[in-house]
Swiss-Prot record:
<dbReference type="InterPro" id="IPR003851">
    <property type="entry name" value="Znf_Dof"/>
</dbReference>
<comment type="function">
    <text>Transcription factor specifically involved in the maternal control of seed germination. Regulates transcription by binding to a 5'-AA[AG]G-3' consensus core sequence. May ensure the inactivity of a component that would be activated to trigger germination as a consequence of red light perception.</text>
</comment>
<feature type="region of interest" description="Disordered">
    <location>
        <begin position="115"/>
        <end position="146"/>
    </location>
</feature>
<keyword id="KW-0479">Metal-binding</keyword>
<keyword id="KW-0309">Germination</keyword>
<dbReference type="GO" id="GO:0003677">
    <property type="term" value="F:DNA binding"/>
</dbReference>
<feature type="zinc finger region" description="Dof-type">
    <location>
        <begin position="74"/>
        <end position="128"/>
    </location>
</feature>
<dbReference type="InterPro" id="IPR045174">
    <property type="entry name" value="Dof"/>
</dbReference>
<keyword id="KW-0805">Transcription regulation</keyword>
<feature type="binding site">
    <location>
        <position position="76"/>
    </location>
    <ligand>
        <name>Zn(2+)</name>
    </ligand>
</feature>
<dbReference type="GO" id="GO:0005634">
    <property type="term" value="C:nucleus"/>
</dbReference>
<feature type="binding site">
    <location>
        <position position="101"/>
    </location>
    <ligand>
        <name>Zn(2+)</name>
    </ligand>
</feature>
<keyword id="KW-0862">Zinc</keyword>
<feature type="binding site">
    <location>
        <position position="79"/>
    </location>
    <ligand>
        <name>Zn(2+)</name>
    </ligand>
</feature>
<keyword id="KW-0863">Zinc-finger</keyword>
<dbReference type="GO" id="GO:0008270">
    <property type="term" value="F:zinc ion binding"/>
</dbReference>
<keyword id="KW-0804">Transcription</keyword>
């Protein structure tokens, strides 16, 4: 260092200022230092005041965040609906919170299983067993109209079912009513107007379900007419076998009358016709003779 600087510094140290100058200098410096002192003093007061009410502000802030945060909707594990709620007063442990579904009305716990017991009571098994007894949906009534079985639908014709109606069953071997109009019934020449056939017994007459008599098989008779209609031969050419043909014709008439009127009252008419047929050949000879007219 230079000697001049050392001397100046030493002189400043030796030249001591008076007390008045020192006080004045301190008074001039105090207004500048007071704000810093106040600031330092007020900082602990502010922290103290904040520390006293800090717990309350933190609590209110957390409450506001809890209220502002919406409750999370938990899906129901049964019906997968979000219409659920958290059970505040029905929780047995906080580790497994309990929820309630308003849709299917079931409780379940988070991490647990779903309860099958609904709100208000009994299980579903008891309800299922009691509902068909209380209100049967499909009551079974007895069938008042039993079906009428035909001969083709009956598996065993020998067994008779008492539950069926009392109508007789049509036999398969009987012919249809239209088959009665055969060549025997109406001849091709239009002369024979009745239905010839064999004599029917009252025991052999079968009645259908409609009440009409059904006739057994008819045997074709070889003699459609008792005499020849062809004029190529003579009128009296077949007089030899006239009694036999008349007998066959009368039998056919009796059979036809028996078919048309199957009653016992018609036996008298058949007997009268038979008496006339057993006469001698004079009746037929007189009928077929050219002179005509003879005694009965």
């Amino acid at each position: 260092m230079d000697a001049t600087k050392w001397t100046q510094g030493f002189q400043e140290m030796i030249n001591v200022k008076p007390m008045e100058q020192m006080i004045s200098s301190t008074n001039n410096n105090t207004p500048q230092q007071q704000p810093t002192f106040i600031a330092t003093n007020t900082r602990p007061n502010a922290t103290a005041s904040n520390g006293g009410s800090g717990g309350n502000t933190n609590n209110t802030a957390t409450m506001e965040t809890r209220k502002a945060r919406p409750q999370e909707k938990v899906n129901c594990p049964r019906c997968n609906s979000t219409n659920t709620k958290f059970c505040y007063y029905n929780n047995y442990s906080l580790t497994q919170p309990r929820y309630f579904c308003k849709g299917c009305r079931r409780y379940w716990t988070e991490g647990g299983s779903l309860r099958n017991v609904p709100v208000g009571g009994s299980s579903r098994k008891n309800k299922r067993s009691s509902t068909p007894l209380a209100s049967p949906s499909n009551p079974k009534l007895p069938d008042l109209n039993p079906p009428i079985l035909f001969s083709s639908q009956i598996p065993n014709k020998s067994n008779k079912d008492l539950n069926l109606l009392s109508f007789p069953v049509m036999q398969d071997h009987h012919h249809h009513a239209l088959e009665l109009l055969r060549s025997n019934g109406v001849s091709s020449r239009g002369m024979n107007t009745f239905l010839p056939g064999q004599m029917m017994d009252s025991n052999s007459v079968l009645y259908s379900s409609l009440g009409f008599p059904t006739m057994p098989d008819y045997k074709q008779s070889n003699n459609n007419l008792s005499f020849s209609i062809d004029h190529h031969q003579g009128i009296g050419h077949n007089t030899i076998n006239s009694n036999q043909r008349a007998q066959d014709n009368n039998d056919d008439m009796n059979g036809a009358s028996r078919v048309l009127f199957p009653f016992s009252d018609m036996k008298e008419l058949s007997s009268t016709t038979q008496e006339k047929s057993h006469g001698n050949n004079t009746y037929w000879n007189g009928m077929f003779s050219n002179t005509g007219g003879s005694s009965w």
